[in-house]
C-alpha cells in the first residue's frame, strides 16, 4: 500500500516537473520569437531611414548640380568679377609688402641720420667746452661763487653762524639786501654774456 502511494506521488512529481520544463521551453521559444520580430522591426526602420537619407542626399546633389550647371550669364559675370577682385587683392598684398619694405628702409635711414647728427652735436659740444678760453673759465668760476653765495642765502645760520650772532634782526635784513644786490648783478651779467656768446 505504501509502495503504491510512493509510486503515485513520484509519478505526479515527475509529470509536474515535465510540465514545468515544457512551459519553460515554450516561454523561451516565445521570447526568442519576440526578440526576432523586434530585431526585424528595428532593421526595417533603419533601412527606411537610410533609404530616405540616400534619397534626400541624391535630391540635394541633383539640385546643386542643376543650379551650378545652369548658371545664367549674370551669375557667370559675378563669378568673373569675384575672381578679378581676389586677384587684385593679392596684387595689393604684394604692393603693401613692397611699401612696408620701403618705409622700413626710410625709417632706418632717418634713424641713422639722427644718430649721426646727435654724435656730431655731442662732439661739437665736447670740443666747445673742452677748449674754453681763459675768459670763459673765469666766468665759470664767478658763476660757481655766485651759486655758493645763493646757498649761503638759503642757509644763513650754517654759512655765517659766527657773523650773525652779534647782529640784531634789522642788521641781518640789511645784510641780506646787500648780498642780494652783490649776487644779482654778476648773475645778470653772466646771463647776458652767455646769451651774447650763443647768439653771436
Curated annotation (Swiss-Prot):
<comment type="function">
    <text>Has antimicrobial activity, but no hemolytic activity. Preference on killing Gram-negative non-enteric bacteria.</text>
</comment>
<dbReference type="GO" id="GO:0005576">
    <property type="term" value="C:extracellular region"/>
</dbReference>
<keyword id="KW-0732">Signal</keyword>
<dbReference type="GO" id="GO:0042742">
    <property type="term" value="P:defense response to bacterium"/>
</dbReference>
<keyword id="KW-0027">Amidation</keyword>
<keyword id="KW-0964">Secreted</keyword>
<feature type="signal peptide" description="Or 18">
    <location>
        <begin position="1"/>
        <end position="16"/>
    </location>
</feature>
<protein>
    <recommendedName>
        <fullName>Bombinin-like peptides 3</fullName>
    </recommendedName>
</protein>
<keyword id="KW-0165">Cleavage on pair of basic residues</keyword>
<keyword id="KW-0929">Antimicrobial</keyword>
<dbReference type="Pfam" id="PF05298">
    <property type="entry name" value="Bombinin"/>
</dbReference>
<dbReference type="InterPro" id="IPR007962">
    <property type="entry name" value="Bombinin"/>
</dbReference>
<comment type="similarity">
    <text>Belongs to the bombinin family.</text>
</comment>
<keyword id="KW-0878">Amphibian defense peptide</keyword>
<keyword id="KW-0044">Antibiotic</keyword>
<feature type="modified residue" description="Phenylalanine amide">
    <location>
        <position position="129"/>
    </location>
</feature>
<keyword id="KW-0677">Repeat</keyword>
<feature type="modified residue" description="Phenylalanine amide">
    <location>
        <position position="68"/>
    </location>
</feature>
Amino acid at each position: 500500500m505504501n509502495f503504491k502511494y510512493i509510486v503515485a506521488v513520484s509519478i505526479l512529481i515527475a509529470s509536474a516537473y515535465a510540465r514545468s520544463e515544457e512551459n519553460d521551453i515554450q516561454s523561451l521559444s516565445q521570447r526568442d520569437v519576440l526578440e526576432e520580430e523586434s530585431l526585424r522591426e528595428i532593421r526595417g526602420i533603419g533601412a527606411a531611414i537610410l533609404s530616405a537619407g540616400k534619397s534626400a542626399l541624391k535630391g540635394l546633389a541633383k539640385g546643386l548640380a542643376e543650379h551650378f550647371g545652369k548658371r545664367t550669364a549674370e551669375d557667370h559675370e559675378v563669378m568673373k568679377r569675384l575672381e578679378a577682385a581676389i586677384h587684385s587683392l593679392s596684387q595689393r598684398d604684394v604692393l603693401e609688402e613692397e611699401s612696408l619694405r620701403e618705409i622700413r628702409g626710410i625709417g632706418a635711414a632717418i634713424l641713422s641720420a639722427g644718430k649721426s647728427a646727435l654724435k656730431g652735436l655731442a662732439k661739437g659740444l665736447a670740443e666747445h667746452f673742452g677748449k674754453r678760453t681763459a675768459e670763459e673759465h673765469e666766468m665759470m668760476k664767478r658763476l660757481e661763487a655766485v651759486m655758493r653765495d645763493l646757498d649761503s642765502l638759503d642757509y644763513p645760520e650754517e654759512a655765517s653762524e659766527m657773523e650773525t650772532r652779534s647782529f640784531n634782526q634789522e642788521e641781518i635784513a640789511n645784510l641780506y639786501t646787500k648780498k642780494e644786490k652783490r649776487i644779482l648783478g654778476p648773475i645778470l651779467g653772466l646771463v647776458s654774456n652767455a646769451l651774447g656768446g650763443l647768439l653771436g
